[in-house]
Amino acid sequence: MATRPSSLVDSLEDEEDPQTLRRERSGSPRPRKIPRNALTQPVDQLLKDLRKNPSMISDPDQRTGREQLSNDELIKKLVTELAENSMIEAEEVRGTLGDISARIEAGFESLSALQVETIQTAQRCDHSDSIRILGENIKILDRSMKTMMETMKLMMEKVDLLYASTAVGTSAPMLPSHPAPPRIYPQLPSAPTADEWDIIP
């Protein structure tokens, strides 16, 4: 025969709250195994797959229905923000590339005009001292133009690398790697050297 509790308080203290029992979870959540093909497929395809099935990178077995729904919505929002940010950055890079190309072309035109003016000035000059000074200036200008051309080449290579790293995962067309066709990288006409002018140093 079961013994009765000494008081009603004792009987309540001995009972366990069923809500507490249901909330207890054993062990830590198991890590979700990402499919192997997700590591090799393109970024844009992976973003599309994540939009359709956010649970592919989470473990729904360890969550309630409401928790899993909240988790899926959060993943969808994050994926959408990543895609939008990537597209915005690609547009900014394309605009920057256009500005750089225009500035480089304008710089080359200015250098060409300066070279032509120098040559015309030398042709109109009859004094040997002035011709010698102009010849030295042409040599300096030629060295400066060569240095600037090398700098422009390095800049274009860096821009290509920046564009390639930013345009991954978007539909932006990739620029060709350096060297590129003349329509993108204008070619500066070669300047005559001092030997071709028969300038005596």
Swiss-Prot record:
Q: Which GO terms describe its biological process?
A: symbiont-mediated suppression of host innate immune response
Does this entry carry the keyword Phosphoprotein?
Answer: yes
- According to the UniProt record, where is the region Disordered? 1-70
Coiled-coil-forming residues are none
Q: What keywords are annotated for this sequence in UniProt?
A: Host cytoplasm, Host nucleus, Host-virus interaction, Inhibition of host innate immune response by virus, Inhibition of host RLR pathway by virus, Phosphoprotein, Viral immunoevasion
Q: Name one Pfam family in it.
A: BDV_P24
Q: What is this protein called?
A: Phosphoprotein
State the taxonomy lineage: Viruses, Riboviria, Orthornavirae, Negarnaviricota, Haploviricotina
Gene coding for it:
P/X
